[in-house]
Amino acid sequence: MARGPKKHLKRVAAPKHWMLDKLTGVFAPRPSTGPHKLRECLPLIIFLRNRLKYALTGDEVKKICMQRFIKIDGKVRTDITYPAGFMDVISIEKTGEHFRLVYDTKGRFAVHRITSEEAKYKLCKVRKTWVGTKGIPHLVTHDARTIRYPDPLIKVNDTIQIDLETGKITDFIKFDTGNLCMVTGGANLGRIGVITNRERHPGSFDVVHVKDANGNNFATRLSNIFVIGKGNKPWISLPRGKGIRLTIAEERDKRLAAKQSSG
């Protein structure tokens, strides 16, 4: 019987959105334990080597990290398998580049570059609120931050804006109909739209109905909804495509149009 934590991850069993091919090796980097789940994170090594192509091998990634060039959410990270996840800000001081991990419409983490101004904050979904010892109110966010003394109006499923330097809450958005949201799980992963209504199902999962900018309607569980803006004004810059998923036919037409204009 195996004792203790698992230390390996086979390539075939790695999450599909990492986009690792089956034939280049047997193993994949197993993410360290951290603020995001294994199936919902992107290890630093995959981001630097496979996405940005700043290194060819894992050894080179280690050399980059060990020089303390890479910051995630304003903190230097030297662990190459550190699990970066949704909404994390990855900064590379040396090149002056900043990235925010957000999903594209195919449910993969997009390489989304942001300005140094935008890299100063991140949005977090409130997972849980409670009153601790001596009556101190706490809240826990989707990236495992515990914040004490929050605004009493902030409830579960709301989104808070955090200043990365101080770790303090600067603003918040209520979970409400008419607000812009991004889907962070399920079949509609990566789609962005405005919340139209919420079906309450006591004892089961609440269902949220969302309408995207093209007028398409879809529904998902409440746990998959991440509010990213008040009204239809997003608080973060959106990746290419603005979270609108095209049908296969629409994608084909778009590709052909691009081909004709270039050819």
UniProtKB/Swiss-Prot annotation:
Pfam family, one: 40S_S4_C
Domain of life the protein comes from: Eukaryota
One GO location term (cellular component): cytosolic small ribosomal subunit
Coiled coil: none
UniProt-listed GO biological process terms: translation
Name of the protein in question: Small ribosomal subunit protein eS4
CDD domains to which the protein is assigned, alphabetical: KOW_RPS4, S4
A GO term for molecular function: structural constituent of ribosome
Primary site of residence: cytoplasm
Protein family: Belongs to the eukaryotic ribosomal protein eS4 family.
Record note on quaternary structure: Component of the small ribosomal subunit.
